[in-house]
A protein has these predicted regions:
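Disordered, low-complexity "stalk" and linker segments at domain junctions of extracellular
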Residues: 1-96
Length: 96
């Protein structure tokens, strides 16, 4: 099995995420199953009003990915993202 990586692209001050630590995980949605990429990325957002950019290795056959986010004081939530394998978390997206 291939090893897929989840990577931090950038942390910027152009969003609405509060300062603190964020944990992200990505699950690839394939036609017949979901593939948990089994890696977690911990990111520190140092400012008030942050945004966090993530990218990961594309999974062959996946057209959608579930990005899972958790923060110290929040329950885990997720959002669906279409390819390409990139997500810019500005804090205004609805994580369910």
């Amino acid at each position: 099995m291939n090893e897929f990586r989840l990577n931090l692209l950038q942390v910027l001050g152009d969003g609405s995420l509060p300062r603190g630590y964020y944990w992200y995980r990505v699950v690839a949605i394939l036609p017949d199953c979901e593939l948990d990429l089994a890696n977690t990325l911990r990111v520190y957002a140092p400012f008030r009003g942050n945004s966090i950019g993530l990218f990961w290795d594309e999974v062959p056959g996946a057209e959608t990915y579930r990005v899972i986010r958790r923060r110290d004081d929040e329950e885990e939530g997720s959002i669906l993202v279409s390819s390409p394998a990139f997500f810019h978390d500005t804090g205004i997206q609805e994580f369910g």
